Amino acid sequence: MKSHSTLAWILCALLGACASQPKEPTRIMMQGFSISLPREKEPTWILAKQTPMVTIIGKPGRFSGESFAMQATVIKLPALDSPAALVKHVESTQRKELDPKRYRIFKVDVAPQKVHEQNCAFSRVEAAEKMAADGTGSPVNVMLETLTLICPHPKDPLLGINMAYSHRHFPEDADPSFAEDAATLMQTLDFEPL
């Protein structure tokens, strides 16, 4: 009886070791950086573009007109001598890129953020896109929330990554887990050899 019990324990251990383990998501390699696609219960993310300089993924939202997107772009940065200079540069650049004729800007917040001991900048932009509803001519506000992480490469501070996660939605369809989902995506960022 003891040998059957021992055999049963060995068999359980072997079967447990052979059980399928969750796979790590595929790393997307970019020039000096890598990221992972989101792991989700539903495989709704679409890889729209992938080059060594740009990766774009997106998925439809739960409601009509709602979408989520993540764009990682390798960028050139000016010579910046401090984390505060990076924050100031990012805020200035983002404000210039937001067209006031197209967007009503509610918030632009930029703060320093450490990623793998590298000084980065983290921003949150909340804006309303001014557009006319189909057929009515009445203006409709479509909200655009964007969380962006900008990091210089540790080996070449003039080379950076701009990783932006955005949610486009009607005002009543805000996603309460937006910031958490963005953080999950941004935590996949790694610096790679140049």
Labelled PLM ranges:
Residues P22-G32:
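Short, low-complexity, disordered segments immediately C-terminal to signal peptides
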Residues K41-T44, L159-L194:
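Surface-exposed amphipathic alpha-helical segments
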Residues Q31-K96:
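Secretory pathway targeting signatures of secreted, lumenal, and periplasmic proteins
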Residues G16-A17:
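C-terminal motif of bacterial Sec signal peptides marking the signal peptidase cleavage site
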Residues K76-P78, E129-M131, H167-H169:
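Beta-strand elements of well-folded, non-transmembrane domains
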Residues E91-P152:
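Signature of long, low-cysteine stretches enriched in small and polar/charged residues
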Residues M1-A8:
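Bacterial N-terminal signal peptides that target proteins for export
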Residues L149-P157, A164:
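A short, solvent-exposed beta-edge/loop patch
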